[in-house]
A protein has these predicted regions:
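A contiguous, mid-protein "functional segment" used to position or interact
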Residues: 190-235, 371-415
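Glycine- and acidic-residue-biased ligand/ion/polar-headgroup-sensing regions
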Residues: 128-131, 136-158, 309-341, 350
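Ligand-binding loop in jelly-roll beta-barrel domains
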Residues: 167-168, 176-208, 322, 349-350, ...
Length: 427
């Protein structure tokens, strides 16, 4: 990787324009843009150039320094990259912000990230008392609270109900077609949603209750709720409540005449109270939440992963399908290998999502020297499964591995027979 200091090296690459006998110093591309507020930052940071391993040349035009700084592996891919791999990364910072009174929603859809046909994601933000209105979906919903506390209320088709306060780190799972509502409890509340439908924005996937009532004849509504024909009870249903609107934090309890969704039937999982499992490789820890400990989660499952500085999620693949990822904090890089010489390396930071194709080989490395990496691994399955490259080689006759890879038998015999999951950085 070649990095060029802004202050030290830009003058060496400047262009001199002569007009009417005078000399004018060429202004860097990033200074000609309407980004004056970023100039102090750019002046102090190094400007990346597409030059490495004796290849490439300095950029003259079309340079977006901020994006290139976040994606060094795109500017200077490793020499091991090759073939054709589509873009597998998206950032919520690029998503259209759907603002309502009391919050906003930012989505990552198949139209944003075409390989993400199995999953869509959404960041939801609610202020105190604001309500993500009563609704249901024709797909499954998996939720993860990233900040604050939200009240989730749900009812199943047998009339069993559940009301829970989900705090940062907690998870919920709403099966397809089951109604629910979410309300912000603290001053600022945010949660991530994952849906097992890449085309989530299409019609027929979300059903808001106010929309239904305002498109139903008034006499039918009164008959449905057993009200007198002269009743005005439903005359003021808002025709455009929106996905989110302001409100007051609910404090009334509700009866459960048909039982509650508790125990193995619970749609809420307090993962914040769950201890991290230390990875055998010593490079971090993880929380696995799937149907083995959260039985209702039959279509979407996941892992919360913490990788220590310079640690690495070992080389592996997932035999049961596509992996969708959300990077909550930290910086990372990953090379996704699709077979037949096709491989591409990506860089990730806060708010990025990714999709790794079915059975593709990959690793995820924390590129920071000081900060932990936190990210989510999500799967369209009832269990989390992975195959470790190290374990596979270690549990195969060593002389076979030696012949295939042209490494010594002693090296193969020294490999750990246990999955390392997350490897520690070497001193």
């Amino acid at each position: 990787m070649a990095w060029v200091s802004t202050q030290a090296s830009l003058p060496e690459h400047r262009n001199i324009e002569r007009t009417a006998g005078t000399e004018q110093t060429h202004v860097p591309v990033w200074k000609r843009r309407q980004t004056r507020h970023l100039w102090p930052v750019m002046e102090k940071r190094e400007v990346p150039e597409p030059t490495a391993d004796g290849l490439g040349a300095p950029e003259d035009e079309g340079q977006n320094v901020a994006i290139e700084l976040q994606n060094p592996s795109a500017l200077n891919p490793p020499l091991t990259d090759g073939g054709l791999v589509p873009n597998l990364k998206w950032s919520f910072a690029l998503s259209n912000n759907l603002k309502d009174k009391g919050g906003y929603i930012r989505e990552q859809l198949e139209s944003d990230l075409p390989p993400s046909t199995d999953f869509a994601g959404a960041q939801n933000h609610l202020t105190k008392g604001s309500i993500r209105q009563m609704h249901w979906h024709s797909c499954s919903e998996w939720g993860y609270v990233t900040n604050g506390t939200v009240t989730i209320s749900m009812v199943d088709n047998d009339g069993r109900n559940q009301v829970a306060n989900a705090t940062a780190g907690d998870i919920w799972y709403f099966p397809k077609g089951q109604p629910h509502v979410i309300q912000g409890v603290e001053d600022s509340n945010e949660y991530l949603l994952v849906f097992d439908a890449g085309d989530f924005a299409n019609e027929g996937l979300t059903f808001n209750v106010d929309d239904w009532l305002t498109h139903t004849p008034a006499e039918v509504i009164l008959k449905n709720f057993g009200l007198d024909n002269r009743s005005t009870a439903f005359d003021h249903v808002p025709p455009n409540f929106g996905s989110i609107n302001t409100g007051k934090v609910a404090d009334e309890s509700v009866d459960s005449p048909f039982g509650q969704l508790t125990g193995n039937a619970s749609w809420y999982f307090p993962a914040s109270k769950m201890e991290f499992t230390q990875a055998p490789g010593g490079g971090g820890s993880y929380k696995r939440v799937d149907s083995t400990n959260f039985p209702v989660s039959q279509k979407i499952v996941g892992q919360i992963v913490r990788v220590k500085p310079r640690g690495m999620r070992e080389m592996h693949w997932h035999p049961n399908g596509v992996e969708w990822l959300y990077f909550q904090s930290g910086t990372a890089r990953a090379t996704v290998w699709l077979g037949a010489g096709n491989a591409r390396t990506f860089d990730f930071t806060d708010g990025d999502t990714a999709v790794f194709p079915d059975n593709s080989g990959h690793y995820i490395e924390n590129t920071s020297d000081t900060d932990d990496l936190f990210y989510l691994e999500i799967f369209n399955s009832d269990v989390v499964e992975d195959v470790s490259l190290i374990q596979w080689l270690a549990l195969t006759p060593p002389d076979l591995v030696s012949q295939v890879l042209n490494v010594s038998v002693d090296v193969v015999k020294a490999l750990s027979k246990e999955k390392q999951v997350i490897l520690a950085a070497k001193p």
